[in-house]
Every structure is written in C-alpha cells, then in structure tokens.
C-alpha cells in the first residue's frame, strides 16, 4: 500500500520583472521542493533556475491515492487544452494569462469527473495571491463576455462599445426583473487592469456579483484549509506527528488492565491513533446535553443533542476554511455541509464538538417497508456540493452536477449506543488496545464476510470508534457496488419520477468502474454515508500514524534501555575505579612493609628452620648467647634505622627491651616468647615505615650542621 504524501503544487514568482509567472509540479514534499526551485538545494527544475527566483508556493492539492492519479492531475493542470477532462470546458478561459489562468484552471479541474470522486484537500499558503488571481480572472472573463464597460479605452462609435452597452442594459433589466440590485461596474483601463481608486472594492464586488468560475467550496470530498508552512510540515511531513497527539504526550494509563494479559500494558494509550482526550470530552458533553428521543424504538440508543459546548483540540493542525469545527483526526469528517442533511454551525455552538460530532454529522438511511430498500437504501443526493460542474466526456460538454431534491424529507439523525455515555480516556485506550490485540491474533472477524481480518488493510466506518464496522477493503467495495446496483435497479424499474432520475449514476469513466465504487453508500451498521475516496484516504492515514506510533514507541524503549545501560556502565566504572584504588593502596602498604622490615623476617625464618632441623641432642644442649642477644644493637637494626630514621624506630632498635632476640632459656617457652616479641616489633616498624614512606621527610637532614 502506497502511504506516501502525494501532492501537486503551484508556484509563482516574487521577482517584479516576472510577476505572474507560475510553475506546476508534483512532489511528495512541497517544502523541500520549493527549496530546490529556489537554489537552496540541488536538483531543481531548469525552468525555475533560469529566471523568476525567488519562488513562493501559493497552494497545493493533496489526497491522491497514488502517484499515478497525482501525475494525471499535474498533466491536466499543465495542459488543460489537450486534456480530455477539460478540453470541452477550457474555452471559457480564453484570454487569461499567467497566474489567473492557472487558478481558473484549478477551479475547473477539481470538478472534473475523474477527480471529483477523490477525497482531495486544497492547502492554501498564500491566500491573498490566490484570491487576487481568482478575482482578476473573474473580472477579465466578465469583460471578455461584454458585461463591463471599459472606461476611456474604446470610442463610442466602435461596434464593441455598442455590444457592451447592450449587454449592460440587458443585465440591468434582468436584475430589475429578478428584484436584485445590480452593483456598480468597476472601471478598467486599456490594459484590462483595475484602476487604483477602487481595486479592492471592485474585486470583492465582482467576485460576489458574478461567479463565472465555480467557487472552491468545501464539501464531503473536497476540503479547503488555510495553513502556514510550519503547520503544514508538522501536520503532514513530520515523522513525529504522532507524538503531537495528546494521547501520546500524556501517556494514558489503563490502570489494572496491564495485569490481565501481555497485550495490555501501562502505556496502552500511547498506541491509540485517536485523540482519546477529545473523544472523552465530546462524549461527556454530548451525553450531558442529550435526551431520549420520543420516537425511539430502542431504549439503548439516544439522539444526538443539537447543542454541544465547544471543546478545543490540542492537536496542532491547520484550521479549516469556512468551518467552525475542530481539526479532523483519523476516521472523522469535519466539512459536512448543511445541504447534505448536516447540522450547521451557529455562533453559539460548535459544529464539531471534537471528533464525536464529526462522526454523527451524516444522516442514516430512511426506513423503508420492503426488505430490499431496508438492506440497500437508495443513494443520497447532494453528496458533493463542490461538484457544480462535471465534464461528460461521451457527450462532449460540461453538465451540472446532481443537486438535492427540495421535496426530500430530512433524514433522522444517527443514534449512539449508550455504552459510550460513561467512557473516558482510559476506556477508549483500553478498547483500542483490546481490538488491536484481537486483530493481530486473528480473532477479529469481518463485519460483512465474518472471515478473520488482517492488520493494516482494514476498512473502518467514518464514525469509528463509535461504529463497530470492521471489514476487508474488498468486502466493502463489493457492498458499495451492490448497493449502487440496487439503487439503480430501483430507480429504473419501479419509479421514474424526475427526482429519482436525477439520482441515476453517471456514465462509466473507465473500464474499471465495476471494481471501484463511484457513488457513496450508507454504512450497513449505522447508516452514515461512506465515500470510497475518503475511506481509502483515512485507511492510509491510519496506517501511517500507526507505523509512526510503533516507531516512536520503539525509539522510546531503545532510549530507556540505553539510558539504563549507561547508568549500569557508570556504576560499574565507579566500583571498578574504587577497587583499583584500594588495590593500589594495598600494594603501596605491602611495599612499605617490605622496605621497613628489611631482612628481619628472613633471618627469623632462617633461625627457625635451622632450629627445626637440628637433632634432639643438639637442641637440648646449652647454647651461648651472642652479644646481640644481650641487648646490643645488630647491624640489621642499624640498617633499618638508617633507612627509616624515625624516633620510635630508633628508640626501639636501641633499647634492650625491644630487641628482636631476647636471652634464650632452657625451657620450651623461650621460642614462643621470642617470636611474639619479634612480631610486635615488626608491626611497630611497619606502621612507622608506612607513614614515612608516604612523606619524603628525613630527620637527619634537619640535624646535620
């Protein structure tokens, strides 16, 4: 599935010498492409590099299912006279040049039979330039048709002036007959430009008085939003768009649900593509103001209240044009018109009320007595209010689109299950987590064929999660084609009134018409109109957001594990360095011990070894004490004192009591006493030697003359 962002953009030059020059192109990132055209990045177009820099983006059209449809739109916009979609309607644009010509072509192209069934969105970056170009196109087209008088440009004897005066007189009489006041005509110079005195007023008056070009009116399948470059990048081009959702930023906690199974975690709300905060607020506000319907047959349903307090969305997305609804999220519509049986926004109320009201904006199918009409109700009229013109290729002309019948009775508003009355953010997050668990384990059946669904390619109703329609994309296409065929058979076989004949489907535009639905169909569960283009667009948007949510969660988990690993490494490094310092101090102490003790331990061991290996007679014989045993200092003691001349060590070496070898006696305890005294003297020498080895201080240096 191609989930890229396909759009066709319109550029215009800001160079005063190239005023009005335009460029039309296709890309998946219009902001990056604009930098390429301006020379900031490489791989720009040759046409925009020669002259006209700097360029600015006026608008772009998005919502194409794949690159082929977007490239077709681009080619038709670039070559309107050669296109089969506009060649029969492009004659009305004769005389237009530069940017007004491109804008007028856009007005006609979005209503062509090939593109009016797609869920397209017009993103306007420079609304002033777009409105000015459309107004100038209206003025020039009206002047070419002879509806305005050129001030001072032609002579009175010219036959063209007489034709213009006759047309002006006829239009004035027609306006008086209709009871409509004809606005004053603006004055034009010889070049066809408006005079400076009344430029803005003339443009506004001309646009309001004569609609030679079909207006860009938002509808179910055509959306208009006035945005900025930063908001556009955050909403459509940023890979961290999912992190801007309040449900992801807040980290909805599902409480004890994480202990029930492995598929539920404490952060299940972060994987929900819906704005659970907005859903809970809308449901709470709706149920607090809703009341039971008097003609309701089901006690478990309620009608939607006409009033709903406004609840702003925290999702940063551009504001829609000509609508007071909140920004649209996944699976919801926000541009439904009052002509389609939808509640219109009032100054004191918000038509959106978040995602809940957008999901309830379309009416359900009317009740019918026959089983056929109950299962497949007839299609609604007035589906796309923006499709005021449609090119009929076989007949070679521009025909008016089907309009809703004035005699049609207003359909009842859709109903909502009562189980959502007490739903909060945690409940929506838990329900979505459970549904995703069932979907990934093959436990979620299709609503139409009851076969298990596979992830990603699942079609949802526009009222999701309030509507439980979950089905395969192919099953939904077959259902819509079947409903369309049933409606056509009902119109052709039973009733042939003019109102129903206007609902007949148009002529097929391609051999693949039987595979792709071309008409909307009511939902089999809730009755809301489902448009194929909107469903495909929402499906791709859902797939993209879910992938980015999973990627963001994976990145967050990796960062947490990396931080934990770094903390463990830091702790290990600190403990290792402390152990190394302890070992170093131990080695220094051992070296000082060996240096302070000198040869005393070796001599004692030698004496003990010789004593152990002598014979019994030799051991019991009386021994003569050496002078050192009588208290005289030995050479070893003097050597130790000279090497580490401390007062305690010197005194211990010179005193008879501290000698290492006392007088030997003939009893058996003499060897034990000698060893004990030797160990005590060695310990005292070690402590003093350790202290002096750490300081390079020598007492004899101070005593020398």
UniProtKB/Swiss-Prot annotation:
GO terms for biological process: DNA recombination; DNA repair. The keyword Nucleus applies. Its EC number is 3.1.-.-. It is an enzyme of class 3 (hydrolase). The keyword Cytoplasm does not apply. Pfam families: GIY-YIG (PF01541). CDD domains: GIY-YIG_SLX1. It is found in: Nucleus. Residues 4-90 form the GIY-YIG domain. Keywords: DNA damage, DNA recombination, DNA repair, Endonuclease, Hydrolase, Metal-binding, Nuclease, Nucleus, Zinc, Zinc-finger. Transmembrane segments: none annotated. A zinc finger (SLX1-type) spans 446-526. Coiled coil: none annotated. One of its GO terms (molecular function) is 5'-flap endonuclease activity. GO terms for cellular component: Slx1-Slx4 complex. Residues 160-175, 310-320 have a biased composition (Polar residues). Residues 155-192, 290-323, 595-628 are annotated as: Disordered. PROSITE patterns: GIY_YIG (PS50164). Its cofactor is a divalent metal cation. Residues 595-604 have a biased composition (Low complexity). Gene3D superfamilies: GIY-YIG endonuclease, Zinc/RING finger domain, C3HC4 (zinc finger). Forms a heterodimer with a member of the SLX4 family. Catalytic subunit of a heterodimeric structure-specific endonuclease that resolves DNA secondary structures generated during DNA repair and recombination. Has endonuclease activity towards branched DNA substrates, introducing single-strand cuts in duplex DNA close to junctions with ss-DNA. Belongs to the SLX1 family. HAMAP family: Endonuc_su_Slx1. This is Structure-specific endonuclease subunit SLX1 homolog. It comes from Leishmania infantum.
